[in-house]
Design a protein with these regions (language model features):
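Conserved N-terminal entry element of GNAT/NAT acetyltransferase domains
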Residues: 1-13, 167, 173
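Short strand-connecting beta-turns/loops that link adjacent beta-strands
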Residues: 9-12, 55, 66-69, 79-83, ...
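Conserved GNAT-fold acetyl-CoA-binding loop/helix
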Residues: 17-49
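A short helix-loop-beta-strand connector motif used in the catalytic cores of GNAT acetyltransferases and
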Residues: 43-62, 85, 162-165
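Conserved beta-strand in the GNAT
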Residues: 62, 69-77, 85-90
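A short, internal acetyl-CoA/4′-phosphopantetheine-binding micro-motif in the GNAT/acyltransferase core
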Residues: 64, 89-97, 124-126
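Conserved acetyl-CoA-binding loop-helix of GNAT-fold acetyltransferases
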Residues: 91, 97-110, 137
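C-terminal "cap" of GNAT-fold acetyltransferases
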Residues: 118-121, 125-132, 138-173
Length: 173
C-alpha cells in the first residue's frame, strides 16, 4: 500500500539525499534508473528542492509505504499553455521494478488533470533509451524537441560524457 502527500519545507532534508541517491553514486546502481555512468555530482540541492516545493503552480508529491518510509517522489509544475511538466521522478533503488513508479505516474496524471492540464510533458536524457522506453510504454511519445544538458552548471550534475541532451516526451491527458 502506497500513500501520497505533498512535500513541505520540512521534507527538504530527507528529500535531497533520497533524490541524489536515486540518480547518482553507488547507491543508485541498485536500481535500473541510475545515471551514475553518465553523470556525477548531485541531482538536486536543498535550495533547488525548496524552490520546487514552494514554487507557484508546482508540487513535489511524496509516496510512502505502509510503514511511512519514503519510497518515491515526483515534481510537477503547471505551465502557462495548460501543460504540466513532470520531473525528478525518483523511486528508492531497492524498491524499483515493484510498481511504485507506475503509481507515481498515475498519481501525477490525476493531479495534472485536476489542475486542468490537457498534456503532460517531461525531458529525459537522450542517452537513456531504457528510460525513454519505460515512458513510451506508459503512453508518452517523443515530440522531436531537444535541449542541451546544462554541462557548465554543477547544480545539475557533472557530466562524464560530453554532448548530453534532453529529449522531450509528452502525453495527452
Amino acid at each position: 500500500m502506497v500513500s501520497f502527500r505533498a512535500a513541505t519545507a520540512a521534507d527538504v532534508d530527507a528529500l535531497v539525499p533520497f533524490v541524489n541517491g536515486g540518480y547518482r553514486g553507488e547507491s543508485s546502481k541498485r536500481g535500473w534508473t541510475t545515471e551514475a555512468d553518465i553523470l556525477g555530482g548531485q541531482r538536486t540541492d536543498p535550495g533547488k528542492m525548496l524552490e520546487m516545493i514552494e514554487g507557484s503552480a508546482a508540487r513535489v508529491e511524496l509516496a510512502h509505504d505502509e510503514r511511512g518510509a519514503l519510497v518515491g517522489c515526483v515534481y510537477l509544475k503547471k505551465e502557462p499553455d495548460a501543460s504540466c511538466y513532470l520531473g525528478m521522478l525518483t523511486v528508492d533503488p531497492a524498491r524499483q521494478a515493484g510498481g511504485i513508479g507506475k503509481l507515481l505516474m498515475t498519481r501525477s496524471e490525476e493531479l495534472a488533470r485536476a489542475w486542468g492540464c490537457g498534456r503532460m510533458r517531461m525531458t529525459v536524457i537522450s542517452m537513456r533509451p531504457e528510460l525513454i522506453a519505460y515512458y513510451e510504454r506508459r503512453g508518452y511519445a517523443k515530440t522531436g524537441a531537444t535541449e542541451p544538458f546544462p554541462e557548465d552548471d554543477p547544480r545539475f550534475g557533472l557530466p562524464k560524457v560530453r554532448g548530453l541532451t534532453f529529449a522531450e516526451l509528452a502525453k495527452p491527458l
